[in-house]
Amino acid sequence: MPILEKTPPKMAAKSPSSEEEPGLPKLPVPPLQQTLATYLRCMQHLVPEEQFRRSQAIVQQFGAPGGLGETLQQKLLERQEQTANWVSEYWLNDMYLNNRLALPVNSSPAVIFARQHFQDTNDQLRFAANLISGVLSYKALLDSHSIPIDCAKGQLSGQPLCMKQYYGLFSSYRLPGHTQDTLVAQKSSVMPEPEHVIVACCNQFFVLDVVINFRRLSEGDLFTQLRKIVRMASNEDERLPPIGLLTSDGRSEWAEARTVLVKDSTNRDSLDMIERCICLVCLDAPGGMELSDTNRALQLLHGGGCSKNGANRWYDKSLQFVVGRDGTCGVVCEHSPFDGIVLVQCTEHLLKHMVKSSKKMVRADSVSELPAPRRLRWKCSPEIQGLLASSAEKLQQIVKNLDFTVYKFDDYGKTFIKQQKCSPDAFIQVALQLAFYRLHGRLVPTYESASIRRFHEGRVDNIRSATPEALHFVKAITDHASAMPDSEKLLLLKDAIRAQTQYTVMAITGMAIDNHLLGLRELAREVCKELPEMFTDETYLMSNRFVLSTSQVPTTMEMFCCYGPVVPNGYGACYNPQPESILFCISSFHGCKETSSTKFAKAVEESFIEMKGLCSLSQSGMGKPLATKEKVTRPSQVHQP
């Protein structure tokens, strides 16, 4: 995501309710003709000429005066008037809740902390107790609406951002459905606020009450209770089947299994405790591998499968903090309630809390007063046993299929890029396009998440980074038979960065095309007997198959974010620009013979080196630095038909 956020002091956030956040504007609806023209411009160079001509005719018919497009646009404007955010429900369903794929790798990103060095299990549990204490402190800030308001950085910096997502961090649960999941927010006048954490250990689940007799447990108390949980979990006579595996299955399969589970009251009670918890803390066994960044990330993404820590999870819960005995720590995130930047802000707050409080010695206290944590019980019929075996097998396939690498480019970082007077994010995106073209000889529809939190209840829209200008640049760079001088290649690089920056501004100001086309499509489902050709056309379908799925997730502390590809023949590319380096997490699938994460990482490296070489021309008097900011046009002027 190209927008970095930081929290300026003395601006207290208000409640997420619409009546208490009047300062933010509603998300605008872009002009219809602007979106249609931009859509054609985004796709023309990515599809065969004949296919494009057919699509162009379909788009012209859709957007004709008095046609279906204008009717749907009017309905969208009415929806904007009547709702807090006209796209949020459509977007949530399309991006997450309708998706039937398993959550590990396919949907749930992970944040990996710096490797810890635990001398023994007590060290591991002290870290976990410290972390839980930090969660409770942060949740108290949320509950009192005391966290500062985020402000945008990067393009159009300084504007306040919507804070609603923060209030879903500890109160959300993704309930599986047969055709569509439900995002449940634990706000109820009937049920009390959750006052427990679920601890996963040895694939067993335990209720850790964090408030007892109206008193929040101290870090020492939490440590005491965690020691009890480890002892209980190690009793093999008491061990129950690894029910958490079911949550790693496809969403429809898990919904089916849950229907079977809830027939028994014991299972219903256990599910209720998990669904209403603040968060999960997963006490992992050692992964048994060298603790490289790549291997630690894999432990967070899928747990290494059912034979390692893959069943020591409950993927429906929005936050699962992993504390491994081998020092592998981080958080697995169910993505539907909030975006990556919000997760990072929360996590950095927790880590800062932990650094401060870890200087104090944690001793067990109040031992005799604390009731023992409760093991969650499960009644497993032969049918459930069969479903568990099936889930385990499918998780193993996910583990085997993921091709993943963490790559650190350390020749330069965002300091050098800023010296070129251009956006680091735009520069990196152009490098990713060049890397893909080097490997595959073409550009493809690319997704880069762009925050629209400047608007009320805003989440993200898409920056389509595979611009015509990027194609001109990558062709020039890779055409070794061409006699094009480097000075002209430099101009093409400037053009590509400028186009990327323009599209970024368009996206963050609510003028991009993806959400708009989604809104028109979903309204068409409601008013038309069948979906219009505009949305069944191969070009439109292809435009939504993001072979390159990218996101900038910057951090100020030692940690990084990663996720999997979103299509079988695609790449996930999450990057974290630092002053003197850029960290990439590249993912793809072994099942696709065309893709390779290590080759892609190598191509990224080559692209950065070549682009730096062109930049040196600028510094040697052949041109000005790659200034882009002053040439950014306002969104309403970009890609006009």
Swiss-Prot record:
Q: Does the keyword Glycoprotein apply?
A: no
- Which Gene Ontology biological process is one annotated for this entry? acetylcholine biosynthetic process
Q: Which UniProt keywords apply?
A: Acyltransferase, Neurotransmitter biosynthesis, Phosphoprotein, Transferase
Q: Indicate which residues the UniProt annotation says bind CoA.
A: 413-425, 451, 552
Q: Does the keyword Ion transport apply?
A: no
Its EC number(s): 2.3.1.6
Which GO cellular component terms, listed alphabetically, does the Swiss-Prot or TrEMBL entry include?
A: cytoplasm; neuron projection; synapse
The record's region (Disordered) falls at: 1-29, 619-641
Q: Which reaction does it catalyse?
A: choline + acetyl-CoA = acetylcholine + CoA
Q: Which residues form the active site?
A: 335
**EC category name:** transferase
Q: What are the recorded GO MF terms, alphabetically?
A: choline O-acetyltransferase activity
Q: Which residues carry this modification: Phosphoserine?
A: 17, 366
Family, according to the entry, reads as follows: Belongs to the carnitine/choline acetyltransferase family.
**Record's function text:** Catalyzes the reversible synthesis of acetylcholine (ACh) from acetyl CoA and choline at cholinergic synapses.
Name listed for the protein in its UniProt record: Choline O-acetyltransferase
